[in-house]
Regions:
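Catalytic core of pol beta-like nucleotidyltransferases
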Residues: 58, 81-149, 156-225
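Short N-terminal "domain-start" leader segments
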Residues: 1-20
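Negatively charged, low-complexity tracts enriched in Asp/Glu with abundant Ser/Thr
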Residues: 1-6, 32, 56-70
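A short, charged, amphipathic alpha-helix used as a generic interaction element across diverse proteins
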Residues: 36-55
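Short, isolated positions in well-ordered beta-strands
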Residues: 10-11, 31, 182-184
């Protein structure tokens, strides 16, 4: 059985050794779950104990929902999350292969430095956002940079703060890594998108740029009107 309780969903069913339960957010993402290993009590008593651990009182309304439908939605969201993680991990793996280290610093080193920088800025300005991930992007992530190219880094976050405001906060000090200027670009799902939706566009753009760099130069012969 399953219930909608406040802004969450709770499902519970019999399993070997007790009761299997899941706590899902309003977006159907798994928050918590496991096995309640006391088969000697009823499923309703087990549910009450789980809800009590969540801080939910017995007086809180429990709206029954279809268990199978809830689990299907949760599985769909989980699969989408797995695919999104693959997009990001594959992009980072390619960057690791093609990135020209900056004074010995790898893409991972750069991402860690930028993460520490933005966390310090969030604390400085008391900005309540959650950082999802930090990814080296731009020409340097594919070894296509020119002399003087910035080091582009994209940061996905969750929160109400605007992308423009975070951009200003993250870049106001002019972060430099190995003498290279870092350009930090915050994105969020409600505007520019997630990393999973944003990075494929970056990949396509850089592939076109690489193809243009490899294309042979075409010699233009001026029109002399037949006179030599």
């Amino acid at each position: 059985m399953a219930f909608a309780i406040d802004d969450k969903f709770v499902s519970i069913q019999f399993c070997e050794g007790g009761y299997d339960y899941s706590i899902l957010g309003a977006d159907y993402k798994l928050i918590d779950g496991g096995v309640y290993d006391n088969p000697d009590i009823t499923i309703h008593a087990a549910l009450n104990d789980i809800l009590e651990d969540m801080g939910v009182s017995e007086q809180t309304e429990r709206v029954p929902v279809d268990y199978e439908e809830l689990m299907e939605k949760a599985d769909t969201v989980e699969q989408a999350e797995i695919e999104a993680n693959h997009v990001v991990s594959d992009f980072k793996a390619k960057t690791n292969e093609m990135f020209n280290d900056i004074e010995g610093q790898s893409p991972e080193d750069v991402e860690q430095t930028v993460h520490a920088h933005i966390m310090a800025k969030l604390e400085e300005y008391d900005i309540p956002v959650e950082i999802v991930d930090v990814v080296v992007s731009g020409s340097r992530c594919r070894g296509l940079e020119q002399e003087g190219s910035d080091l582009d880094v994209v940061v996905e976050y969750k929160g109400r703060e605007s992308e423009d405001d975070l951009f200003n906060a993250f870049n106001e000090d002019g972060l430099m890594i190995g003498g290279v200027k870092v350009d930090i670009n915050p994105i969020t799902e409600g505007k520019t998108g997630t990393l999973a939706t944003y990075l494929p566009g970056v990949e396509s753009y850089l592939a076109e740029k690489q193809a243009m760099q490899k294309a042979p130069a075409v010699e233009v012969i001026p029109d002399t009107g037949g006179k030599y």
